[in-house]
Amino acid sequence: MYKKTLFTLSLSFVVLFAAAQEVRQMSLQEATDYALEHNQNILNAKLDIEVAEGVVKENIATGLPQINANLDLAYNFSLPVSFLPSEFIPGAPPGEQVAVAFGTKYSGNASVGASQMVFDGVFFVGLEAAKTYKELSTKKHIKSKIDVVEAVSKAYYAVLVNKLTLELVEKNYGRLDTLLQETKEMYQNGFAEKIDVSRVQVQFNNIKVNRENSTKMLGVAESLLKFQLGMPINEEIALTDELTLDIFDDAKEGSFGYEQRVEYSILQTQERLALLDIKRTKVEYLPKLDLYASLGAIAGTGSGANLFNIGNEWFDFGLAGVKMSVPVFDGLRKHRVLQQKKVKLQQVHNNYDLLENSINLEIEQKQVAYENSVKTMNVQLENMKLSQEVYEITKEKYQAGVGSNLEVINADADYKQAQTNFFIALYNALIAKVDYKKSIGNLL
């Protein structure tokens, strides 16, 4: 009894917990805002900006003082020899070279060295290039945001269209179910033939399968939307926007300039990077100037233990200086490199014309596709209304005994086909709207 009660309480808790999970309400704007915070591509693009910031700091660090400490303790188990004339060695035979070992069995060297760059043109150009690279990463982040907004918008519209399709399929299901029951009654009363019932039954079976398929397609569309949002698939959402024909009125607002396209802005940054790359090669012709200093102590002894006798065995040393490096001739290497980078800059300039022509063509194509899709949608909407009228009139005639069952079946098939054509046209118009707004840089 106790176990049964415990199981009942546990089950009740699970039910209450599931009921407590709220369904997330989302408009299209809320969906895009959510995606811009949670989509994995956006998160990776943000990390790229952090990497670029790290590159800037890394370049700054190379211009700061560099300090290093060194400690070297050695056991010279076999000292190298040098050859000296015998005149320097008392008691050695004259005219000969005498091998003499210099050094101690144990030696030590401890030092601290510091250096400071005073002038290096490559450093300053590299620092500027690193900041420009960060700017490029930021613009690529914007491009990722545009791509995500595009994907989310299309997925959001797909859910709305599939939802409307399912609602209409449900109405068709109820309508055909009613027609089937009426036809069966007419058959039982002798006012219809068996073939009339079979025809309606075929249509009813088809709409039953269509309803199941539409339900599954709506689930797939919702899963795709959650994927684009960066949301767990098992989280429940409800879309709050509704599809009306007014949604197509704002797609062609405003004027267009190439700067509105993030690809154009990215190309401008790439041009600056190419110019800085040329500048970097040019400054390699300039001298480099560095300051340096070192302070330490050395020791040499015949006993390893004496190396740790800092007071008596170690002797201080120190130095400071300035170092200038002047490039004189490198076999024309920098000249050849400079020519290559100028060619690459010319390629970037050519890409301006290529990108502008590509944008112009894309806008023209997307605008025509959008206008045509809206016209097609309006025509299919009118066809759907007309086919509905035809079906209703045909059904009334059949119920009044002046029409045939076959006419009703054909009118029903035409009506459902008109519905399918309209929803396909509606979805195509929505996608074309998103594509056109992206082409004119008005999506984000």
Language-model-derived ranges and their functions:
Residues M1-L28, L36-N39, F423, A429, ...:
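Bacterial Sec-dependent N-terminal signal peptides
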Residues A20-D72, S78, I233, L239-L275, ...:
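Bacterial Sec-pathway N-terminal export signals of envelope proteins
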Residues L43-L47, I60, S107, V118-K145, ...:
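Sec/SRP-type N-terminal targeting helices
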Residues A61, N206-M231, K385-N442:
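Short segments within alpha-helical structural elements
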